[in-house]
Amino acid sequence: MKGSLIIVVFFVLGIIVSLCDVIPSSFPASDVSYYALCCLMFCVGISIGCDTSILKSFRKVNPRLMMLPVMTILGTLAGCAAASLILGHRQLSDCLAIGSGFGYYSLSSIFITQYRGAELGTIALLANIFREILTLLCAPLLAKYFGKLAPISVGGATTMDTTLPIITRYSGESFIIVSIFHGFCVDFSVPFLVTFFCSL
């Protein structure tokens, strides 16, 4: 929750700074976004490569539960496709690109801003932050009424880090490895799916 609020604060500060004309109009904002994206992808690669224990722990995951990330991805994309029918002013590819962030707001919003512009990037940022906050706030209800796997699926890419403690609390410690595996797989899919739908 704290991390999400910090991101929102910096986002709002960026808007205020731009509106106050503090930054010159010649400032290469798109180039900065691109280099920030490259740095972020580099850091993601380092974090995965350094933590070999994550890869080793995946051997303990029940083979049937390995399908959970696939179901999360398909369910999210189906929901986004349905939303595009209601939001007539948005293309199907826009909605699918936003949904493909799966809660990974920092990466997906930069990608979408780079490919589709600041407006859609902002929507992606807020939509994915709301997904994380929804998981944090509703995990008890999700686990109670929809089963122990529900908070994991709703958490999307966040289940290996920010939402892991709350999932562990309400789904149980037996789901820790499943949650990490789920988050890793969904997290890994984000750059590929977002760029794919943005290119349509």
What are these regions (language model features)?
Residues 46-57, 83-84, 110, 139-143, ...:
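C-terminal ends of transmembrane helices
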Residues 52-81, 121-133, 178-186:
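Entry/N-cap segments of selected transmembrane alpha helices
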Residues 66-112, 130-146:
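Transmembrane alpha-helices that form the ion-translocation and gating core
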Residues 93-133, 148-181:
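Alpha-helical membrane segments and immediately flanking helix-loop junctions
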